[in-house]
């Protein structure tokens, strides 16, 4: 029991101490905030007092100045000296708008040229302060400069539109450029498909040499060619010479014919050609024609050339195949 009671007292004491600390912190912060709140009010109040004091001083000086101008009829030199006295007063610019009516003081030097009317230009300065009703005379010189300004103002206004019209008149005859008619592009005509073609290959000897006739004859016969019409060789559908001719072989030298007894015969090369369309599948016939040309070139030691007698390339072979397809589509 004693231990529990002691523990309770310790807890209660700790809570009380914390509460006192919190209360003290809160009161000190509250007093500090109240001090900061009072400072701006005091500053504003002191500033207003100073401003009101300055206004009273200025009003007193203005009243005294009016009394001096009424009583004193001194010469023009003395009056000019007195009229120059307010200038240091206007060097100070108070923060309030109540001192703005004293700005017209700059106008009196213009009206002080005649000596008799010297005191009058100083009076309009004091009219907005004390006696605007008792001195109507300064109002007349103010109205006189206003009337010429109003009359002179419309003159540039009426003359302004004239140059504008003159500048606008030369622009009237200018006609807007008309868009030129755009020529429509001519319709692109599709290239007419060819309905027939001739595929040509050449088997030629190397540069500066010729093919042997006996060796050439044996290679031609091994490739399935048979001597026939027009004294040239033909490759038929069947190797024994039966069936329609698929492609033919002629001499590269004019007139292009051969002699079956050409043991002592030599030539720079031979030409293999195929007419499209032909019997059967033209693409298969083209492959057989290419194989025959390669076989003859290998046997005689020559090379395969295209229709321009240039080295045969894969691009040229694809071109031949495209021509064959085009002819087939045109005749389909």
Swiss-Prot record:
Cytoplasmic side: 28-332
Compositional bias per record (Low complexity), positions renumbered to this chain: 99-115, 123-151, 160-175
Topological domain spans for side Periplasmic: 1-6
Transmembrane segments: 7-27
One biological process term in Gene Ontology: FtsZ-dependent cytokinesis
Compartment list: Cell inner membrane
Compositional bias per record (Acidic residues), positions renumbered to this chain: 51-63
SMART domains: ZipA_C
Stretch list, region Disordered: 42-190
Record's keyword terms, sorted: Cell cycle, Cell division, Cell inner membrane, Cell membrane, Membrane, Transmembrane, Transmembrane helix
Pfam (any one): ZipA_C
Lineage top rank: taxon: Bacteria
Membrane topology recorded in Swiss-Prot or TrEMBL: Single-pass type I membrane protein
Any one Gene Ontology cellular component term annotated for this protein: cell division site
Family: Belongs to the ZipA family.
HAMAP family assigned: ZipA
Function of the molecule: Essential cell division protein that stabilizes the FtsZ protofilaments by cross-linking them and that serves as a cytoplasmic membrane anchor for the Z ring. Also required for the recruitment to the septal ring of downstream cell division proteins.
Subunit note: Interacts with FtsZ via their C-terminal domains.
Name of this chain's protein: Cell division protein ZipA
Gene: zipA
């Amino acid at each position: 029991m004693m231990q529990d009671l002691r523990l309770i007292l310790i807890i209660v004491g700790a809570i009380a101490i914390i509460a006192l600390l919190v209360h003290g912190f809160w009161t000190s912060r509250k007093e500090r905030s109240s001090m900061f709140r009072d400072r701006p009010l005091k500053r504003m109040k002191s500033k207003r007092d100073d401003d009101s004091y300055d206004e009273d001083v200025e009003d007193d000086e203005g009243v005294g100045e009016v009394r001096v101008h009424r009583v004193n009829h001194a010469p023009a030199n003395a009056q000019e000296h007195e009229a120059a006295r307010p200038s240091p007063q206007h060097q100070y610019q108070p923060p309030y708008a109540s001192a703005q009516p004293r700005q017209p003081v700059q106008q009196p030097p213009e009206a002080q040229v005649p000596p008799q009317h010297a005191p009058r230009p100083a009076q309009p300065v004091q009219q907005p302060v004390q006696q605007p009703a008792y001195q109507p005379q300064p109002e007349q010189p103010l109205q006189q400069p206003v009337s010429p300004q109003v009359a002179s103002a419309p003159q540039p206004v009426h003359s302004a539109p004239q140059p504008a019209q003159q500048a606008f008149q030369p622009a009237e005859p200018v006609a807007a450029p008309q868009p030129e008619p755009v020529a429509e592009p001519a319709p692109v005509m599709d290239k007419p498909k060819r309905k027939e073609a001739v595929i040509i290959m050449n088997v030629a000897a190397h540069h500066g040499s010729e093919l042997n006739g006996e060796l050439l004859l044996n290679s031609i016969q091994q490739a399935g060619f048979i001597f026939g019409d027009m004294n040239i060789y033909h490759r038929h559908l069947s190797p024994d010479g039966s069936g329609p001719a698929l492609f033919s072989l002629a001499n590269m030298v004019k007139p292009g014919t051969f002699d079956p007894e050409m043991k002592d015969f030599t030539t720079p090369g031979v030409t293999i050609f195929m007419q499209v369309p032909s019997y059967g599948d033209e693409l298969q016939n083209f492959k057989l024609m290419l194989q025959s040309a390669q076989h003859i070139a290998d046997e005689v030691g020559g090379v395969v050339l295209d229709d321009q007698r240039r080295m045969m390339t894969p691009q040229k072979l694809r071109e031949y195949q495209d021509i064959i397809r085009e002819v087939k589509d045109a005749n389909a």
